[in-house]
């Protein structure tokens, strides 16, 4: 069944373009709201989730307690790698969501790392 909608805070699998230019299926956290998705015919923004911690200053370890159900592997939000997708690019949904209080924390870290710079 084709995906017609995703929700803010949902973890989905999408074809993510990585910094080296390769495109690989990866889990990602939907960070944009539903209004954008409705207004732009299915467009949404998501932040990369990886099992590798290559960018220590930009990653957040994901704790099982932050989710409604745990991921299959130890993983990290890679807060500086964000991309746009369309709902028709979603490869898999697993009904996994980041709890609201942790969603706000992750978004704050994305803003700090991408827009506001790191505090010294």
Question: What is each model feature region?
Answer:
Residues 22-25, 30-66:
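Compact nucleic-acid interaction/catalytic patches
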Residues 4, 67-120:
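C-terminal terminal-subdomain/extension
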Residues 17-21:
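Short, charged beta-turn/beta-strand-edge "cap" motif at the junction between a beta-strand
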Residues 16, 33, 81:
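Residues immediately flanking
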């Amino acid at each position: 069944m084709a995906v017609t909608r995703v929700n803010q805070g949902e973890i989905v699998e999408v074809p993510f373009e990585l910094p080296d230019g390769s495109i690989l299926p990866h889990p990602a956290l939907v960070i944009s709201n539903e209004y954008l998705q409705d207004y732009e015919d299915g467009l949404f923004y998501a932040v990369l989730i990886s099992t590798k911690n290559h960018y220590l200053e930009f990653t957040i370890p994901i704790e099982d307690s932050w989710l409604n159900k745990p991921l299959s592997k130890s993983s990290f939000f890679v807060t500086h790698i964000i991309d746009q997708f369309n709902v028709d690019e979603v490869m898999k949904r697993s009904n996994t969501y980041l709890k609201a209080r942790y969603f706000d924390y992750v978004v704050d870290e994305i803003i700090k790392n991408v827009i506001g710079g790191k505090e010294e």
